[in-house]
Amino acid sequence: MEPELAAQKQPRPRRRSRRASGLSTEGATGPSADTSGSELDGRCSLRRGSSFTFLTPGPNWDFTLKRKRREKDDDVVSLSSLDLKEPSNKRVRPLARVTSLANLISPVRNGAVRRFGQTIQSFTLRGDHRSPASAQKFSSRSTVPTPAKRRSSALWSEMLDITMKESLTTREIRRQEAIYEMSRGEQDLIEDLKLARKAYHDPMLKLSIMSEEELTHIFGDLDSYIPLHEDLLTRIGEATKPDGTVEQIGHILVSWLPRLNAYRGYCSNQLAAKALLDQKKQDPRVQDFLQRCLESPFSRKLDLWSFLDIPRSRLVKYPLLLKEILKHTPKEHPDVQLLEDAILIIQGVLSDINLKKGESECQYYIDKLEYLDEKQRDPRIEASKVLLCHGELRSKSGHKLYIFLFQDILVLTRPVTRNERHSYQVYRQPIPVQELVLEDLQDGDVRMGGSFRGAFSNSEKAKNIFRIRFHDPSPAQSHTLQANDVFHKQQWFNCIRAAIAPFQSAGSPPELQGLPELHEECEGNHPSARKLTAQRRASTVSSVTQVEVDENAYRCGSGMQMAEDSKSLKTHQTQPGIRRARDKALSGGKRKETLV
């Protein structure tokens, strides 16, 4: 019986604590097969009773004072007890310094590989059991963007010696700061032009992201303008004294500013260049390249078009810079007259550039027009050289319309896209300006939207609406248009009213010449007050005497009868309408000025 009991208790010493493992090898591994039961009982009895000398325990007693582990815990191995040290000569790179694999993939033409590279960035290794705080720490460290490169914004007075600064007046310091701002702006412009060539044009040409013809169309002759601005910078540098001051700059500007006419071709091509660039951005390779450049420090968080538009924005700053220099120049200074001449020169240059750009923009949109019917073609459209206004409005049915107001005709279109080419489909018949009638509609006069449910709903009525139509209702055409807000409505009113004013003032009835103006006290004796008054009289008469006929009536079969009825109503309502307008004008009340 005793040998069987000893055999059953044989694996128990294995489950003892580590303190018990310090015994002899024989005690730790258990007795051998030839060990007798009496020897085992004696040894175990002495070990168990060594901690308690006041009694002699039996063979079934266990005083290890340790919890008993379950049988399934015997096979559990703790990683903390293993020696996992790396070799001392192994190179280990910290995880935070490992670059994303997607960033290491160079731009390729294969779309599948490119999508793979984009997908890698969204992977998350869930086997990492770090705490959320540590994970957030690593992610924030790896996603910190590279800081953008900033330019020095130091003023001229900050770089001046203290003793020199005390010897100059406040006005002279401000004059020198204005001159320094002009020279510093020229330096920044030169750097941006070189950067556009080096960081955008040349890499895209080398990587075949765009063809040479496309790049020439987008960038233009950007390189030819770098020597132009370097020449001005050199002249200002030669005129600068050792102490950093510039005595005279007027003669330099008078001789240099006319050379800015070289920008006429570049500015005229900007609209077409912007359209081509937007079209090429649909190419994933182009978009990926531009996005990489945008995230680089050299771009200063500016996209490619911002660099291409810098010359135009620089041109419009020259008058402001010259006026600032003139403002702080003493009247007895020889630069006064020269600066005034320079301001006139730059204004003339900008006027010529704007005229050329307007003609190019006008022709660009004319080429984008598509006609559904040959009757829509009008020779006044092809002969247009000036585009007065253009933009998006909504029709009465809620559809988006794009309106072009040329100097002689107004064209309503619908934007369409065919084969990735944007164009404008002419909608209805174009309206010549001399036949155009503009009507102001108050908020809520017309319900917008063509749905059946909207006709019976109590929804908010339309705002910022007006109506345009033919003066002769025989073409059976009228358009109720809605602007986005009051500001855009006012802009459209001013533009359309200025276009139709010469025709309305010439054809105004003689009996309406005595109609007083609503705000005569605001006009005074201004030279253009009479012309403006005549325009407002004609437009006011048109808004007062016209009867609002629903535009759907023009499309029905009885259009001629409706026109005759409207004419009869006009004859009966003309005199009362004029009388009411005259009474309100003479009352002197706080009445808002009518837009039309």
From Swiss-Prot:
**Residues covered by region (Disordered):** 1-44, 127-146, 562-596
Q: Which residues carry this modification: Phosphoserine?
A: S21, S32, S100, S106, S122, S508
> Which residues lie in Polar residues bias regions?
22-38, 133-145
Region entry Necessary for nuclear localization, spans = 1-74
Motif Nuclear localization signal mapped to chain:
12-19, 66-72
Inducers of expression: By TGFB1. Up-regulated by DNA damaging agents like H(2)O(2) or ionizing radiation (IR).
Matches recorded under InterPro entries: DBL_dom_sf, DH_dom, Endocytic_GEF_Adapter, GDS_CDC24_CS, Net1_PH, PH-like_dom_sf, PH_domain, SOS1_NGEF_PH
N-acetylmethionine: modified positions = M1
Q: Name one GO biological process term.
A: cellular response to hydrogen peroxide
Q: What GO cellular-component annotations does this UniProt entry give?
A: cytosol; nucleus
Limits of the DH domain: 174-356
The superkingdom listed in its UniProt entry is Eukaryota
According to the record's subunit comment, the protein's assembly and interactions are: Interacts with RHOA in its GTP- and GDP-bound states, and with CDC42 in its GTP-bound state. Interacts with the PDZ 1 domain of BAIAP1.
Free-text function comment from the UniProt entry: Acts as a guanine nucleotide exchange factor (GEF) for RhoA GTPase. May be involved in activation of the SAPK/JNK pathway Stimulates genotoxic stress-induced RHOB activity in breast cancer cells leading to their cell death.
* Protein name, UniProt field: Neuroepithelial cell-transforming gene 1 protein
Q: Which organism is it from?
A: Homo sapiens
